[in-house]
Swiss-Prot record:
It is found in: Cell membrane. One of its GO terms (biological process) is protein transport. The keyword ATP-binding does not apply. This is Preprotein translocase subunit SecG. It is a single-pass membrane protein. The keyword Flavoprotein does not apply. Component of the protein translocase complex. Heterotrimer consisting of alpha (SecY), beta (SecG) and gamma (SecE) subunits. Can form oligomers of the heterotrimer. Involved in protein export. The function of the beta subunit is unknown, but it may be involved in stabilization of the trimeric complex. The gene is secG. InterPro entries: Preprot_translocase_SecG, SecG/Sec61-beta/Sbh. Belongs to the SEC61-beta family. Keywords: Cell membrane, Membrane, Protein transport, Translocation, Transmembrane, Transmembrane helix, Transport. It comes from the Archaea. Residues 1-31 are cytoplasmic.
Length: 54
């Protein structure tokens, strides 16, 4: 591999980072605490269902 093939990697990824960091007014905004709470409730629900199935 020559060093000339990998010269544009950082420049092309910088555009993607800028694209995904852009705020969109119409996007769904979910608080990270809500995601953690949902995950905990889901895990507890799975444990309860496993306990009832035995």
């Amino acid at each position: 591999m020559s060093s000339g093939q990998n010269s544009g990697g950082l420049m092309s990824s910088a555009g993607l980072v800028r694209y995904f960091d852009a705020e969109d007014r119409n996007s769904i905004r979910i608080d990270p605490k809500t995601i953690v709470a949902f995950g905990v409730l889901f895990g507890v629900g799975v444990l309860v269902l496993n306990a009832l199935a035995i």
